[in-house]
From Swiss-Prot:
GO terms for molecular function: amino acid binding; aspartate carbamoyltransferase activity. Heterododecamer (2C3:3R2) of six catalytic PyrB chains organized as two trimers (C3), and six regulatory PyrI chains organized as three dimers (R2). It catalyses: carbamoyl phosphate + L-aspartate = N-carbamoyl-L-aspartate + phosphate + H(+). Keywords: Pyrimidine biosynthesis, Transferase. The lineage of its organism: Bacteria, Pseudomonadati, Pseudomonadota, Gammaproteobacteria, Lysobacterales. Belongs to the aspartate/ornithine carbamoyltransferase superfamily. ATCase family. This is Aspartate carbamoyltransferase catalytic subunit.
Amino acid sequence: MTAQQIDASGRLRHLLTLEGLPRETLLQLLDRAGQIRDAAVGRVGNKRQVLAGSAVCTLFFEPSTRTRSSFQLAAQRLGADVLNFDASTSSTRKGETACDTLRNLEAMGVRGFVVRHPDDGAVAALADAAGEGTALINAGDGRSSHPTQGLLDMLTLRQAKGPDFSKLKVVIVGDVKHSRVARTDLHALRTLGVGEIRVCGPQSLLPDDETLKGCVVGDDFDAMLEGVDALMMLRLQRERMEEGLVPSLEQYHAQYGLTNERLARAGKDAAVLHPGPINRGVEVTDEVADGPQSWVLRQVANGVAVRMAVLETLLG
């Protein structure tokens, strides 16, 4: 897939996954996003119109609030016209394929597509169908990938702990098995050379494939917290209870919920991240989510800068 998203000259053509993305490319995107964030580019009265005259479509086949809004703001701040595609009211309900939808929008002059889809590999398939000069960005597909979330998580981690990841200990907590965010963050952390990756959750929610290769894996949250520099808490999807993978929300919180008492076991000033939406009282308590070690809202803010950097790189 990497060859598909990078052209023969080494230029990023699409952003489909962070798996296999060269470290240099990853760092360039993070550096540019950091510049945008630090300069507060994109605020009212300080717009960079590098995409003026370009059209970007958010093509979402799954619900989204943060990701869609963040991409829309990013594109608008770069001067692009933004078309929001709603699958529930589109011709896809009449049987039109996603590829035909893409081609019709291309014919209208849309150059960039931000796509979210419930199926693994769906965005890559659309990239295969796209014409020359069209760029696709994966805004989350199935369980496999969510590259801009991974980028904003890494940007937030750099902001919290500095650019050198080699001595950092990071723990990812929760439903790793069904999480595209966890898979994406694992690829990014490995590429950036993080010192130690720990993964913690109920055995029923941990993958049994190569996903966790090289990680320290365990189901004892209190033990896995010792000395960590950052915690990436994952959303517990309520359907996992219906599938019998989690006995109850109360029991999950008792074993894997982050409280101030538990956070005290982590390293000094450990950063708490969460991709959202947060189930308060399940993954984290109110005190942690709103506390001084929470970087959750800074993740959201960094998301706009990251998506501006990606759009600028692909379409600018």
